[in-house]
Amino acid sequence: MINIAIDAMGGDFGEKPIIEGVLKALEAKPFNAILVGNSKILKPLIPKKLEQYIQYEEASEIFSMNENATDALKNKETTIYKAINLLKEKKVDAVVSAGHSGASMSLATLRLGRLKGISRPAIATLMPNIINKTLLLDVGANTDCKAENLFQFAIMGEVYARAIMQIQKPRLALLSNGEEECKGNELTKESHQLMKKIPNFIGNAEGRDIFNGEIDVLVCDGFDGNVILKACEGVATAIFQLLKNEVKQSFISKIGALLMKPSFKKLKKHTDWQEYGGAPLLGVNGCVIISHGKSDSRAIKNAIFQAINFSQSHINELIENELGKYNA
């Protein structure tokens, strides 16, 4: 059975939504949960019927969202340090944390190390499109990149799309300010030349192409990726708020909204980041799923499902094998 370490107290809302998410996941799939935190606080939240699947790793401190990520290595008593250390010692198969994302990245990279052939890890996230989903990476691990970094991101994204998204030949694109090969800055142009080696590379793509369903994996540096991610979150929130405002304008609008309610629910679910759970940190020697600090129980549950799928798919081995084809 898969063993997953959960940073049980690192989110913005404390341990309650995290534990609720763990319990929901346990009711749906079998795995062993190692809760990292204060067991005196956590144990009363666990029902007797699920106690057999729960273990505890004591951690007396929480790495604050206000702390600098570079300080994560200094305090070995934090929940995120203890969780990552369990993975380093091979006592668990994966880590899920809704705590300080910078600390998670820093600890995972320095404590676990990088995969063979990977110079920098990348955070990957799923973005909804009109047909299914697009994998976007990097969305925050690296604000400044070299062309070789983006090439490695492309390989990792392609492998993830095949293994997890079940896309046999994922369409891979590079984010730029135009589709033409000559468009973009020096980084984009140099990266484009490297990515030509990849059979499934379809060329440059613009920001609007994320949502048309014609791209499965979109590669960019962490600065652009994070801006895109946050902008999309804001746009989605604004659109739903505008719809609510318009519905209130007349009785006919309210009737129409009532008739459209099932469709609105499907749309909201498709665009809701909580449905995707978390973002895998690709390129480190282990499975680390980084969840949003504001994750509710549903997001934590889905992040755990991601961790299970990642662990069972042997993605890291596949990434090293795929990179080996180009480095040989």
Curated annotation (Swiss-Prot):
Keyword Glycosyltransferase: no
Membrane-spanning residues: none
SUPFAM superfamilies: Isocitrate/Isopropylmalate dehydrogenase-like
Alphabetical UniProt keywords: Cytoplasm, Lipid biosynthesis, Lipid metabolism, Phospholipid biosynthesis, Phospholipid metabolism, Transferase
One Pfam family linked to the record: FA_synthesis
GO MF, one annotated term: phosphate:acyl-[acyl carrier protein] acyltransferase activity
InterPro entries: FA_synthesis (IPR003664), Phospholipid_synth_PlsX-like (IPR012281)
Enzyme Commission number(s): 2.3.1.274
GO cellular component terms given for this protein: cytoplasm
Reaction equations catalysed: a fatty acyl-[ACP] + phosphate = an acyl phosphate + holo-[ACP]
A GO BP entry: fatty acid biosynthetic process
Pathway(s) where this gene product acts: Lipid metabolism; phospholipid metabolism
Cell compartments where the protein resides: Cytoplasm
Function according to Swiss-Prot or TrEMBL: Catalyzes the reversible formation of acyl-phosphate (acyl-PO(4)) from acyl-[acyl-carrier-protein] (acyl-ACP). This enzyme utilizes acyl-ACP as fatty acyl donor, but not acyl-CoA.
Assembly and oligomerization: Homodimer. Probably interacts with PlsY.
Family according to the record: Belongs to the PlsX family.
Name of this chain's protein: Phosphate acyltransferase
UniProt lineage: Bacteria, Pseudomonadati, Campylobacterota, Epsilonproteobacteria, Campylobacterales
Gene designation per UniProt: plsX
